[in-house]
Curated annotation (Swiss-Prot):
SUBUNIT field: Homodimer.
Protein name, UniProt field: Orotate phosphoribosyltransferase
Chain's gene name: pyrE
Binding site for orotate: 34-35, 128, 156
EC number: 2.4.2.10
NCBIfam families the record matches: pyrE
Organism: Vibrio parahaemolyticus serotype O3:K6 (strain RIMD 2210633)
Cofactor: Mg(2+)
Keyword Secreted set for record: no
UniProt cross-references to Pfam families, sorted A to Z: Pribosyltran
CC per GO annotation: cytoplasm
Pathway: Pyrimidine metabolism; UMP biosynthesis via de novo pathway; UMP from orotate: step 1/2
Protein task: Catalyzes the transfer of a ribosyl phosphate group from 5-phosphoribose 1-diphosphate to orotate, leading to the formation of orotidine monophosphate (OMP).
């Protein structure tokens, strides 16, 4: 695990974005941890969050032309990632996001920001069912662009309804890499390193044994 990944886990715990306990997911599964990126909700939080997304992008080596943030949660993520890439990596990246409702006045259309062209890096908080990615792919294709990859904050590394995870299904269906700042495996490594979270560690390991990919 790299330093920025460890720092991201500590940041998420500090802001209570990442919690350990018992949580019922939409799927009905009882999960020993929960991640709610909506709690990164101040200017300083967003600035720090962007640095982690930018670090993961730089680490991935994936080449892309435009950052795309799907409405709504992806919008501030794309914005802060673009700022962090410029400030910390000297990469001036165009960014774009969509509106849920197309405008019929002013500049019109359902896209805001840069033109959606070339190789697109989609940024979002998590992938659960992959629905937002599929909707975004329709927008990307309609603009004649290609999906270079997808970056999310956390990869839960768990099966969906079949044997694959939602992320693996996206990789299979769209032929692109899906990367994350951290994964479930990184959380387990972090808990093992801490040495004082045995209860949480055992619960997360048991969850991975049952639902992990």
């Amino acid at each position: 695990m790299k330093a920025y990944q460890r720092e991201f886990i500590e940041f998420a715990l500090e802001k209570e974005v990442l919690k350990f306990g018992e949580f019922t997911l939409k799927s009905g599964r009882k999960s020993p941890y929960f991640f709610n990126a909506g709690l990164f909700n101040t200017g300083r939080d967003l600035a720090r969050l962007g640095r982690f997304y930018a670090a993961a992008l730089a680490d991935s080596g994936i080449e892309f032309d435009v950052l795309f943030g799907p409405a709504y949660k992806g919008i501030p993520i794309a914005t802060t990632t673009a700022v962090a890439l410029a400030d910390h990596h000297d990469i001036d990246t165009p960014y774009c996001f969509n509106r849920k409702e197309a405008k019929n006045h002013g500049e019109g259309g359902n896209l805001v920001g840069s033109a959606l062209e070339g190789r697109i890096m989609l940024v979002d908080d998590v992938i659960t069912a992959g629905t937002a990615i599929r909707e975004s792919m329709e927008i990307i294709k309609a603009n004649g662009a290609d999906l270079a990859g997808v970056l999310v904050a956390i990869d839960r590394q768990e099966k969906g309804k079949g044997e694959l995870s939602a992320i693996q299904e996206v990789e299979r269906d769209f032929g692109c890499a899906v990367i994350s700042i951290v994964s479930l495996g990184d959380l387990i490594t972090y808990l093992e390193e801490k040495g004082n979270a045995t209860e949480h560690l055992e619960a997360v390991k048991a969850y991975r044994a049952e639902y992990g990919i």
